[in-house]
Amino acid sequence: MKNRSSSPPLHVHVDENTPVHVHIKKGQKTTPAKCQQKHKQKMKGNTVNVRRAVQVKTKAPWMPPGKTSVLDSTYKWEGPTHLLEITPPESEKMMSVLRLSDLSTDEEDAVCCKMNEYERKIDSLMNVVGTLKNEAKLQKQEQRQQMTKRLLEEQKEELNEVTQELAESEHENTLLRRNIERMREEKDLTMLQKKYLQHEKECLLSKLSEAERDGAAAAREIHALKSTIERLNVEKHMSSSDINMLTRQKELLLQKLSTFEETNRTLRELLREQHERERDVQKILEKQGVLMKMLADSDAEKLQLQMRLQDKEKEINNLAVQIQEEKEQARTASELSKSLESVRGHLQAQLRHKEAENNRLTTQIRNLERSEAQHKAEVECIKDQLKELRQKADRDKDALKRALRAQKERAERSEECAGQLAVQLAEKDSYVAEALSTLESWRSRYNKVVKDKSDLELEMVTVNSRIADLLEQQATLEDKMREDRDALMDKLHQQTTETTSFRMENERLKASVVPMEEKLNQAHVEVQQLKSSVRNYEDLIETYKSQVLKTRMEAADVAAKLEKCDNEKKALKDEMNKELELARKQFQSQLAELEKLPEILRITETQLAECQDQLQSYEKKNMDLSVMIADLRQRIELQGDKMEMTRERYQSAQEEKKQLTLKAEELERKLETTSTQNIEFLQVIAKREESIHQCQLRLEEKTRECSSLARQLEMAIEDAKREVEQTRERATSRERAAQSKVLDLETQLSRTKTELNQLRRNKEDAERRYESRLQDLKDRLEQSESTNRSMQNYVQFLKSSYANVFADSALLGSPGRSRSSP
């Protein structure tokens, strides 16, 4: 019994409206302080919401439970250490009443606070997601603006290149015009030179014919001298006529030889000059061919530039059409984006509403779980009561052994308690069944909500896919968008006026200033390269100019040489005339001397011997001259061949000149067409230069604004970087905290699920044990009833036996009395 008296405290789960009064007996070892400590520990562990009234009682004689006052309609149960007194709700007397509504709601408040915190976190996360989406949109807009700026800069560069190419083409056209004028002048010079060459060739031919004639005359004179000398050798007697003939022939020979030598010298000089002129002409022709190639190349380049200009104009027109189309597409895209944002806001509102409903359902489910936990605690209390009932049954058995009356009373009390407990168990079972039905209904509602949530998620996925498709379409449209320069400037003005997006705009401008500076540096490098190329072209032009000057100097030298040749020819003609006059004078003087022949014959006779000696020497000289004449004939033949070659070359040169004249005419026509086209291009270029000048002025203004904004950008970027770092740190900390909380919640959910499963299993095991114990109690009650019946039968037997005995004794005593009485 002592071991039984040190049993654990009692747990009782009661309805909200039933007041509870508990009496606790003082054991040998328990104290009120210890009971209070146990009560506090139980209150902290959320076990039972029952207030105990601790009363220290003195030991009183045991009173049977059946003899209590009838007025008190309370249910009492007394054990070795506790006394349970339950008053129904109808009774007006309430001692230490406790209701469940008076219990603490700290847990519910904490759960509500946690739910509010989670809702706030979800709202903050949604706001962060919205800010991130806005940042992504702004980044996309910045990328679009950067792409448009790049495209505009590329178009500007292309326009600058085209203007530079046009300037170069104009410069080349001017150079070509100058070259063509020079070619015309050179053509005039070449015509004069050809006439002069023809005159020189005629002079050479006349000189050659004269040289041939002089050679033939010299040969005749030599042949006549040979015949006279042979005749004189045969006759060996010279007359005065023979002497005169010899002297005449001698003089004629000398004259012919002198003229032949002079003509040979002049021919050699003329041939040398002719060779030099031919070389100069070949050089000039080569230079003309080079110039013609340059002209052809320049014409081809002009045609290419014209084609490029036409292509550029077509591209500009196409770009203008595309820009208009892209503007329309941008408008449609903006309308679509607005509609998408409205749909998105509607969906977000629906999601928030569904999340709020889910949170409400989760709170209701948690409340149901709490009620289940309370029911489990009540079941545990009932189990404890069953344990105590078992103990009580054991005690009742012991009491039955001691006394039949106490056993009967306790049996009746146990029957009453069992009935009450059975009623309570039935009520609890019905309450548990109702709770399970409510749980199933809540689960069905929760499943419906989960299904609705999954449907909404699917709808969100479809909407997101549609949004992604629309974003892709918008991206394609944005890739195609190439806005004009004025539109960009207007956008820049509008974006500068926007105060809300000032920081993002500053970052965008900072990001756009860096590639602009890089492009400016590239443009400066390209300008330097173009300047170097222009310098190279200028050097080439100077070289061409120097070559042209050289050719002009050479032509002037050739003209001077030709003038010198003309002067020399005139001088030679004058000298020839003078020599002829001198020869005439000599012949006249000789004729005058021949009149004095008889005086001279004597002298001639003396001179004949000398003449014979001289003849021998002349014969030797004649042999040498014949050899020289053969060489001269060969040379003349070679010169004739060369003259034929020169004639053929002259004819080919004339044909080439004709072709060149035709080409020059074609070039003049092309120049006229190109001049008209250049005038048109100049007009177009002037208009474009005006527009470019205006754009440059705007760009300068914008560069100034950008420089002023860049300074502000640096400060704003630093602040933005700090804020971004702080926000990133906060976001990372929030994400970590959220992840940790999510993990904790998941672990708590898993724990609660495992606990629920364990509690369900324990509940099932407890129900099985309870049923088995109820069956045992029923069996024991039947046994106790059978023992009671047997005891009653035994008592009746004893009564009957005692009655019989006492009746027999009474019968036996009655006759003795009767006998003594008389």
UniProtKB/Swiss-Prot annotation:
Entry's localization field: Cytoplasm, Cytoskeleton, Microtubule organizing center, Centrosome; Cell projection, Cilium; Cytoplasm, Cytoskeleton, Microtubule organizing center, Centrosome, Centriole; Cytoplasm, Cytoskeleton, Spindle pole
GO terms (BP aspect): cell differentiation; regulation of cilium assembly; spermatogenesis
Coiled-coil boundaries: 113-418, 452-490, 516-796
A cellular component annotation (GO) from this entry: centriole
Domain of life: Eukaryota
Positions of region (Disordered): 26-45
Disulfide bonding pattern of the chain: none
InterPro entries: Odf2-rel
Keywords per UniProt: Cell projection, Cilium, Coiled coil, Cytoplasm, Cytoskeleton, Developmental protein, Differentiation, Flagellum, Microtubule, Spermatogenesis
Family that this chain belongs to: Belongs to the ODF2 family.
Subunit (UniProt): Self-associates. Associates with microtubules and forms a fibrillar structure partially linked to the microtubule network.
Role of this protein: Seems to be a major component of sperm tail outer dense fibers (ODF). ODFs are filamentous structures located on the outside of the axoneme in the midpiece and principal piece of the mammalian sperm tail and may help to maintain the passive elastic structures and elastic recoil of the sperm tail.
Name used for this protein in its record: Outer dense fiber protein 2
Biological source species: Gallus gallus (Chicken)
